């Protein structure tokens, strides 16, 4: 019983500290490095990991007040990483930071998060900038059609991964944030998600070799199942742990099937 309790506490720490979501984002980035044959650069990975922790911390708070020493260390490390990146990678980080700031801070009493349907696309776009374009620019990879296809594919996938969170938050978002569940209902949201999963898998089938296709097919089906079983009343671990686990599981599959 004690070991189970300790595991639960550890999982709670990973979730509350935003370490787990950072692991999820970095898993997508490493998957891109594997697929494209890129080097996994220390500074790019470091700034993505700790930058995600910082971004989600400020989003939860709704302001930019730093209340812990550990977060100050994260910020300092991110600055250190930033000045060791390629200039194109720095532009990605700056763009992501600007979007994160306006996602949180209101302009004329509104932030990007409060604009109808914008929330999900901003989050997905930031994930793709960090997980796809950051490692590509840092490794000076030649941009080709495949890069655009995988960007679109991952963008679609991340949108579907966000939908269970929007379903969970429907009762909180109704009065202040317009999302697909609050505007069109849970059933419509799930149907939309299934269509997007199908699109994600279709793109994968035509652009990827077998090992990547198998990894993405399994991960896509798991994503669809998590969406199917999503509801407004759910365990606190359903989205924050299990849904966030999908990119991590995908990376493991990708490594095993190479």
Residues of each region from the PLM?
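Helix-coil boundary and interhelical linker segments in multi-pass alpha-helical membrane proteins
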Residues: 27-46, 78-91, 131-152, 203-213, ...
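Interhelical loop and helix-boundary elements at the membrane-water interface
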Residues: 2-23, 61-71, 104-125, 179, ...
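Solvent-exposed interhelical
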Residues: 48-73, 155-197
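Catalytic cores of Mg2+-dependent Asp-rich isoprenoid enzymes
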Residues: 6-49, 53, 190-201, 208-258
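Short juxtamembrane and helix-loop transition motifs at transmembrane-helix boundaries
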Residues: 4-11, 56-62, 79-87, 110-113, ...
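Functional transmembrane core segments of multi-pass inner-membrane proteins
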Residues: 120-170
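Intramembrane alpha-helical segments
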Residues: 65-138, 226-227
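Transmembrane alpha-helical segments that form the membrane-embedded catalytic/substrate-channel core
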Residues: 50-61, 95-109, 129, 154-170, ...
């Amino acid at each position: 019983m004690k070991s189970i309790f300790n595991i639960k506490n550890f999982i709670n720490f990973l979730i509350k500290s935003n370490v787990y979501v950072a692991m999820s984002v970095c898993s997508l980035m490493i998957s891109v490095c594997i697929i494209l044959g890129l080097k996994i650069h220390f500074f790019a990975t470091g700034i993505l990991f700790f930058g995600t922790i910082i971004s989600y911390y400020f989003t939860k708070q709704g302001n930019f007040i730093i209340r812990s020493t550990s977060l100050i260390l994260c910020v300092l490390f991110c600055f250190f990483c930033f000045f060791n990146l390629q200039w194109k990678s720095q532009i990605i980080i700056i763009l992501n930071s600007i979007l994160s700031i306006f996602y949180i801070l209101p302009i004329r009493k509104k932030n990007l998060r409060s604009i109808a349907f914008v929330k999900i696309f901003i989050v997905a776009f930031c994930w793709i900038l960090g997980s796809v374009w950051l490692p590509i620019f840092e490794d000076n990879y030649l941009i080709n059609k495949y890069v655009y296809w995988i960007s679109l594919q991952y963008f679609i996938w991340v949108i579907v991964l966000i939908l269970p969170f929007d379903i969970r938050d429907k009762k909180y978002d109704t009065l202040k944030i317009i999302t697909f569940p609050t505007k069109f209902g849970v059933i419509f949201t799930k149907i939309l998600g299934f269509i997007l999963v199908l699109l994600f898998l279709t793109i994968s089938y035509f652009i990827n070799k077998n090992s990547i296709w198998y990894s993405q097919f399994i991960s896509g089906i798991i994503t669809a199942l998590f969406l199917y079983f999503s509801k407004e009343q759910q365990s606190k671990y359903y989205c924050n742990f299990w849904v966030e686990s999908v990119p991590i599981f995908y990376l493991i599959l990708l490594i095993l099937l190479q």
